[in-house]
């Protein structure tokens, strides 16, 4: 695996892969890697791509009340994980490389960026779009792989790529879960033992709501009951809603097709947990 810390080093390594006839897939991360990130790399390798993975904690997607310094970092561990997962290039830029002096171009995202996380974290998706556009420009991949756990982010990236006519195929990869159903996240390490024991209830409640929607037309009542149940178990729920999967608009009745998601965000102690559920995952799990 190549380690690239400067843009010329990255570009040379990518050129070597292309010269060898490889297609390039890109997996952007903020580090503190876990099995969820590894699943993205493996998904790309399974489609016969050589994989470039970035590790960069992007400051522009953190709001004023969010602690950038607290975000977990483990570069040595990340490099070891990427190497054994089969990554071809680890891209480890610093802040000055990503945001050089005089940097004056940003994004104001609309559409799928406006509600849910976008409403609660103003500017967050502007920062996500900014860094992803820069990374795409640096790596110039044929494809990029993102986890479905951050469903809204995935739709924002799809919108960004389409709007800017970027020649990058965007792939969503199913959420990776712990054995008890908790969605894997770098922030899970901040849960206390007591909170960790409670945390899987978030996914179980999504499953219960999903199965209830299969037999009841009243999504609003089902989601209202889910919020009450979670709050009663120690969560502080930001939202729990049935949405159209692509537009992220709220819907009242479960549609027949696959273009829907149950989404939720809730705080447990100091940790904010996100999760979502679609038809394919609902079919695999019992409530």
Swiss-Prot record:
Pfam families (UniProt xref): Pantoate_ligase
GO cellular component, one term: cytosol
Binding locations of ATP: 30-37, 147-150, 184-187
Subcellular location: Cytoplasm
EC numbers on record: 6.3.2.1
Gene Ontology biological process terms from the UniProt entry: pantothenate biosynthetic process
GO terms, molecular function: ATP binding; pantoate-beta-alanine ligase activity
InterPro entries in the record: Pantoate_ligase, Pantoate_ligase_C, Rossmann-like_a/b/a_fold
Family, similarity comment: Belongs to the pantothenate synthetase family.
Miscellaneous comment text of the record: The reaction proceeds by a bi uni uni bi ping pong mechanism.
Protein name: Pantothenate synthetase
Source organism of this protein record: Granulibacter bethesdensis (strain ATCC BAA-1260 / CGDNIH1)
